[in-house]
Amino acid sequence: MRPPAFWFTPPDRPALAARLLAPLGQAYAAATARRLRAPGHRAGVPVICIGNLNAGGTGKTPTAIALMQRLAARGIEAHVVSRGYGGRLEGPVEVDARRHRAADVGDEPLLLAAFGRAWVARDRAAGVRAAEAAGAQAILLDDGFQNPSVVKDLSLIVVDAAVGFGNGRCLPAGPLREPVEAGLARADLLLSIGGPEAQRRFATDWPALPVPRLTGRLATLQMGMYWQGARVLAFAGIGRPEKFFASLRAEGAELLRAEALDDHQPLGEALMKRLEIEAMALGAQLVTTEKDAVRLPPSFRQKVLTLPVRLEFDDGSALDAALDRLNLTARS
């Protein structure tokens, strides 16, 4: 289900629906604040939370990949702990791409497991304990910023610069899980992801934020595929599929059809067969995101191309300084 348009009107000009739903948004914010007062488990290794204030996709998965790689470059074995949204396993269980499917552990953990060790646990504290027992030198908590069950040593809030914090209101009046001021008061860093124009607009709409701000962009990973002039039928079931379609166009692909699916939508045989027939009729190649690709039926994995993207920081010095303060210790 796509988010309603009134979530993204300017904060100083809320739509009628947002104003009518404001009391429910205030109740949601109050419930979140009460929940956050609960005590949490203190791990024996640093816990880095990659969270957001918005419901839906903001770029947490590419951020987790970038942090895994950054920590690996320091000699640190970081394990990701995720709730495993969309998967059936409650865990704690370590994700194994050889035996797990997205229906078992969720698409994001399955993708992250290609870059390092990843765990799924409905009980995040139990997942952290399992990862620590398995030798993790640092924990990357995928989401969970509004979950108090684990004490965080570093919290990085990720926001899509193109949409910012929407109308600044909490669910269901707006896209927020908690008020911006309350969330950023607990955060250590804010990462806004987007191109130069989106970054300028975000800085104008949300000036004087009480937390250091990093900027970055999602860049296409060059894998030898020449996209210029390629006729494609693109499909994506992510938070903002239009970003994926825009990336393909920026690479020079000719999008003959773009199908936006619901976030985490299952890619069953019937759906994929329909898309395959449409692509054949158009003379187009099926293309999707890395995160969607892990949900493909086995019979379609060789038929669908992916456009991988990676997070590139404009200046990662503030992040590196924050990691330095964690006193991470690499094992020999």
UniProtKB/Swiss-Prot annotation:
The keyword Lipid biosynthesis applies. It is an enzyme of class 2 (transferase). Coiled coil: none annotated. Pfam families: LpxK. NCBIfam families: lpxK. Transfers the gamma-phosphate of ATP to the 4'-position of a tetraacyldisaccharide 1-phosphate intermediate (termed DS-1-P) to form tetraacyldisaccharide 1,4'-bis-phosphate (lipid IVA). This is Tetraacyldisaccharide 4'-kinase.
